[in-house]
C-alpha cells in the first residue's frame, strides 16, 4: 500500500498534533455533484452503483478531485448488511428504501443468518480495495456501517419510518425478539467492518442515525449496548498504525459521556450540540467530529465562513477536532458553497494549531 501523504484526519482522531483542522463531509460523494449524477445515471440505479466496484470507486474519488478534503469515505449504503441477510432491498421512487421481507416476527429473526463479508458482501470489499489502491496514499479511507439499532429499524419497519411504531412495539412487548435481532446484527457488523479494514479501510465509523428516537434508558439497552459490543470486537491496528473508530448517534447529545465510555476514539456530533459544551464534557476522552448544520451551506458564502469560525472558536485550541457537517450534505447545495466551506476550515483553523 502507498504511504499516506496526508494523515491529518487520522492524527486528529487520535488527538495527535496537526497543522490545521481536518475536514470531510458526510455524503460528500452525492447528489449535489453533477459528476455524481452522471455516474449514477450510467449505473442505472443506486444499488447498481453500490455493487459496481469501479463506479463506486469513481464516485468516492469525485469530491477529492474538486476539494482539498482530508479523508475519503467508501461509497456504499448502510442497508448492504440487511440486504445480504436476504430481506430483498429495493428503492421506491420518492419513498426511499424498502424491504420485501421485513423481519417483524421472532420466527423471521431466528431464520436470519450472519452474512459472510467476503461472499455476500464481496462487492463492498472489492470497492474498498479498489478505492484504497486508487487513492494511492492521498488521504485515508473511511469504512462504515449502520448501527444495529438503526439497521433493525429498517428491517422491522420494512423501510423508513417517522414514528418507529413497529420496532418500538417489539422493544417493549417482545424485547427478547429484538435483542436476538440486535445481537445478530452486532455480530454481522463486526465482521463487516473488520473485513473493510482487512481490505484497506484506515478508519471506521458507525452511523446510529435513529438512536435519537429512543428514550434515555432505551438508548442504552437497544442501541449503545450493541455499539459497545462492536467496538469491543473491532480490529484497531492495521498497516502499522491505529484504526480509529468514530460513533455517531444523530440526536445523541444527551449521551456523549456514555458513548465516550465505549472505548471508541471519537464521537460524531449533530448540529444541535454545542461543540464547546461537548469538549468540556468528553474532550478529555475522545476526539469530536462535526458539527455545522448542513443547511448552512445554502447561506451566502460569507455567512458560511462566519459559522465555520464560530465552531472552530467553540472547540478552541489544540487537536482532537475533525470538522464535518452535523449530518449529510443536502442534494440541492451549490458545490461552490461546499468548496468555500472546506477552504474556510483550513484557512481559519491554522491559528488553533500553533
From Swiss-Prot:
InterPro entries from the entry? UROD/MetE-like_sf, Uroporphyrinogen_deCO2ase_HemE, Uroporphyrinogen_deCOase
* Cellular compartment(s): Cytoplasm
Q: Which residues bind substrate?
A: 27-31, 46, 77, 154, 209, 327
Query: Can you name a GO cellular component term?
Result: cytosol
Enzyme class, UniProt record, top EC level: lyase
Q: Which GO terms describe its biological process?
A: heme biosynthetic process; protoporphyrinogen IX biosynthetic process from glutamate
Q: Which Pfam families match?
A: URO-D
Query: What pathway is it annotated to?
Result: Porphyrin-containing compound metabolism; protoporphyrin-IX biosynthesis; coproporphyrinogen-III from 5-aminolevulinate: step 4/4
User: What Enzyme Commission number(s) appear in the record?
Assistant: 4.1.1.37
Q: Which domain of life is it from?
A: Bacteria
Q: Which residues form the signal peptide?
A: none
In terms of Gene3D superfamilies, this protein maps to: 3.20.20.210
One GO molecular function term of this record is:
uroporphyrinogen decarboxylase activity
Which reaction(s) does its UniProt entry say it catalyses? uroporphyrinogen III + 4 H(+) = coproporphyrinogen III + 4 CO2
**PANTHER family this protein is in?**
METHYLTETRAHYDROFOLATE:HOMOCYSTEINE METHYLTRANSFERASE RELATED, UROPORPHYRINOGEN DECARBOXYLASE
Instruction: Supply the NCBIfam families for this chain.
Output: hemE
Family, per entry = Belongs to the uroporphyrinogen decarboxylase family.
> So what does this one do?
Catalyzes the decarboxylation of four acetate groups of uroporphyrinogen-III to yield coproporphyrinogen-III.
- The identity of this protein, by name, is Uroporphyrinogen decarboxylase
Question: Which source organism?
Answer: Shewanella oneidensis (strain ATCC 700550 / JCM 31522 / CIP 106686 / LMG 19005 / NCIMB 14063 / MR-1)
What's the encoding gene here?
hemE
Amino acid at each position: 500500500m502507498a504511504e499516506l501523504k496526508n494523515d491529518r484526519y487520522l492524527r486528529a482522531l487520535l488527538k495527535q498534533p496537526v497543522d490545521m483542522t481536518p475536514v470531510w463531509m458526510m455524503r460528500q460523494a452525492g447528489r449535489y455533484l453533477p459528476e455524481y449524477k452522471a455516474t449514477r445515471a450510467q449505473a442505472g440505479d443506486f444499488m447498481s452503483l453500490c455493487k459496481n466496484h469501479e463506479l463506486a470507486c469513481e464516485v468516492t474519488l469525485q469530491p477529492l478531485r474538486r476539494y482539498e478534503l482530508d479523508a475519503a469515505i467508501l461509497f456504499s449504503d448502510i442497508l448492504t448488511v440487511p440486504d445480504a441477510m436476504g430481506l430483498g432491498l429495493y428503492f421506491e421512487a420518492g419513498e426511499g428504501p424498502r424491504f420485501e421481507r421485513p423481519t417483524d416476527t421472532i420466527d423471521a429473526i431466528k431464520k436470519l443468518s450472519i452474512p459472510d463479508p467476503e461472499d455476500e458482501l464481496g462487492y463492498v470489499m472489492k470497492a474498498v480495495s479498489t478505492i484504497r489502491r486508487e487513492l494511492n496514499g492521498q488521504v485515508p479511507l473511511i469504512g462504515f456501517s449502520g448501527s444495529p439499532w438503526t439497521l433493525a429499524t429498517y428491517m422491522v419497519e420494512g423501510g423508513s419510518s417517522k414514528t418507529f411504531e413497529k420496532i418500538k412495539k417489539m422493544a417493549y412487548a417482545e424485547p427478547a425478539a429484538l435483542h436476538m435481532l440486535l445481537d445478530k446484527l452486532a455480530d454481522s457488523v463486526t465482521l463487516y467492518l473488520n473485513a473493510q479494514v482487512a481490505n484497506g479501510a484506515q478508519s471506521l465509523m458507525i452511523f446510529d442515525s435513529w438512536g435519537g428516537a429512543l428514550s434515555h434508558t432505551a438508548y442504552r439497552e437497544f442501541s449503545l449496548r450493541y455499539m459497545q459490543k462492536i467496538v469491543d470486537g473491532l480490529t484497531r491496528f492495521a498497516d502499522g498504525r491505529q484504526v480509529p473508530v468514530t460513533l455517531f448517534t444523530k440526536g445523541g447529545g444527551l449521551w456523549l459521556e456514555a458513548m465516550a465510555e465505549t472505548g471508541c476514539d471519537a464521537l460524531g456530533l449533530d448540529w444541535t450540540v454545542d461543540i464547546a459544551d461537548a469538549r468540556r464534557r468528553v474532550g478529555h476522552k475522545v476526539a469530536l467530529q462535526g458539527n455545522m448544520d448542513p443547511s448552512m451551506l445554502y447561506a451566502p458564502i460569507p455567512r458560511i465562513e462566519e459559522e465555520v469560525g464560530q465552531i472552530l472558536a467553540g472547540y478552541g485550541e489544540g487537536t482532537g477536532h475533525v470538522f464535518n457537517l452535523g449530518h449529510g450534505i443536502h442534494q440541492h447545495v451549490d458545490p461552490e458553497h461546499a468548496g468555500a466551506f472546506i477552504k474556510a476550515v483550513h484557512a481559519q483553523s491554522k491559528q488553533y494549531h500553533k
